[in-house]
Amino acid sequence: MEDTTISIRALEPTDIDLLYDWENDPEVWHLGNTIAPFSRFVLEQYLVNSHEDIFSTKQLRLMIEYNDGENTAEAVGSIDLFEFEPLHRRVGIGILIAREHRRKGYAKQALKLMLDYCYNTLNIHQVFCNIEADNHESIRLFTKLGFVECGHKKQWLWRNHVWVDEIMYQHFDHHK
């Protein structure tokens, strides 16, 4: 999956250092409901099993790469599908862009590619995401792409000794 500057690809063993850094950054733990660091061994095992089919694991993690046009590709983030329900034709989506690559449009491009993949390859009817109410950049990103708010969970997450609301958004494939 790719467009002019962004491609989405499967995980490779060479991604271990990036995944280790991203998964062990306490500033983003709350996004994945993580409360402890991941060992390199655990992440290596995850990579070994990452080839398994989304229909059996109900989840899929892919890497987002930026291509500068000179055959140089750099991993700038990851994108996840989770809670895949083929019977009900829905899946959750989450995205992480490395801090130094944010605000460059990569997330928007990657999400467009993944929505196309969900609707045209996985035959999904709806994609959903859960965003903390104070994550204004993510809310703006997802709503610009046509996600609509469908639920507001009050005091859903406990973060830094404060309750945080979580908002659920949905995006529908209106062509099927």
Predicted regions and their residues:
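Short Pro/Gly-enriched beta-strand edge/turn motifs at strand-loop
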Residues: 43-48, 150-152
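A generic structural motif
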Residues: 65-67
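Surface-exposed charged/polar residues within alpha-helices that form helix-capping/stabilizing sites
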Residues: 21, 49-52, 99, 116
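Acyl-donor (CoA/ACP) binding surface of acyl/acetyltransferases
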Residues: 1-15, 70-176
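A short helix-loop-beta-strand connector motif used in the catalytic cores of GNAT acetyltransferases and
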Residues: 48-63
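Generic structural signal for secondary-structure transition and capping sites
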Residues: 16, 27-28, 52-55, 123
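Short structured motifs
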Residues: 46-49, 77-79
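A short, well-structured alpha-helix characteristic of acyl/acetyltransferase catalytic modules
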Residues: 1-45, 175-176
